[in-house]
Design a protein with these regions (language model features):
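Immunoglobulin-superfamily
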Residues: 1-105
Length: 105
């Protein structure tokens, strides 16, 4: 496999329902695997260590990862812009993802 900077292939618009757990997906092709995946909301890095509202999971693939941000009991203020930033030893990529409330399109 060729090594290269990370490349995010997720869509820039994702959807979720108010009151439920909403998942925002950051699908990344990255060889070597990412050293870091960072989620940003309102210009601040989401601190998973201190947050009960946000968590994440990561599924490793041979050529990258799928990193999913989980938002517990999503409220009106949770919809809007998120940023997924991915770093590996070859470079960086980022994607602005707009989370849209289902039924509000």
């Amino acid at each position: 496999m060729l090594t290269d900077r990370p490349q995010i292939s997720s869509t820039g618009k994702q959807y979720g329902a108010k009151g439920s757990t909403v998942n925002v997906e950051c699908k990344v092709r990255s060889v070597p695997l990412p050293e870091e995946v960072t989620w940003i909301r309102n210009n601040e890095v989401i601190d998973f260590a201190t947050s009960e509202h946000y968590s994440f999971s990561e599924e490793k693939k041979p050529d990258g990862v799928i990193n999913t941000l989980h938002i517990q009991r999503a409220g009106s203020g949770d919809f809007g812009l998120y940023n997924c930033t991915v770093v590996n030893s070859m470079g960086i990529d980022f994607l602005a993802i707009t989370l849209i409330e289902k039924g509000q399109c």
